[in-house]
């Protein structure tokens, strides 16, 4: 079964006014996917959104505001139909590389680069969206710290604000770094998922910090993206379990792409492999591997095709979250997805 979606679109090039300080852009997504891969909407809702509208207002030379509004055709408790994925103010200290940011944005927990329609399972496990206050430094070496009010409280923690730390090194062709998250339960997948439902607004027995590391490299026509996300300690048995023990979810993703040019037509060939560990309760597969093609035949049109094969957890595996049980099914599933993007 194929599901196709499309909605109206507005482009900044046809705007009624233009301003040097205000820029905005939009993306319209037409998606076709078999029923298996369509279920990923629940995991990474924003990836198959039908409309994304981004804007940036340069208030002064040292102050800018950014926003990204998304219209979701399949809303969830963590990503409603009209969803400000990002809306924040950023202050750059003059004559320095120090910045401050305040507002709603993705935390710097991992760096999940991808050339695919469906992003890696490491992103599913680690991406975290919060209303946060951030201080950072950005140059060849970078570091930042984010402070936020959590969605799920930990009964053993008295901290009023939780935090996220990130540091690394980058240039035009490489980005490598490590990240720390005070509570991995703040990730969107832990908050809401297809497995046991999610931890949104729940009180947890124990704190489970998260760790992420990444290495992204582009060399000539080849790109390589490697990411790893893990719980540092196991969850309490009552909060999340795997085979009758506290679960310690992990995910590893490897993606390689190669740019091909045939006369005036260029495209990317992409290969990828994802592996998860003790993540059955979250409703994501044990393994995923596949191939993809990505092309931009016109400046305003992008086309992506992806084939993947999912391997679920074995049928003797059992998991739970907040006393809701999830069983392994030992299935293999082929997934197809096609996406056209109007910019």
Regions found by a protein language model. Give the residues of each.
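Outer-membrane beta-barrel biogenesis signature
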Residues: 2-26, 37, 265, 301, ...
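Outer membrane beta-barrel
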Residues: 13-36, 40-153, 158-159, 164-178, ...
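Short acidic/His/Gly/Ser-rich catalytic and metal-binding motifs that mark active-site loops
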Residues: 35, 109-113, 186-190, 235-236, ...
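Extracytoplasmic loops and strand-loop junctions of Gram-negative outer membrane beta-barrel proteins
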Residues: 36-38, 70, 115-118, 194-200, ...
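Outer-membrane beta-barrel "beta-signal"
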Residues: 165, 328-343
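C-terminal hydrophobic structural anchor segments
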Residues: 262-314
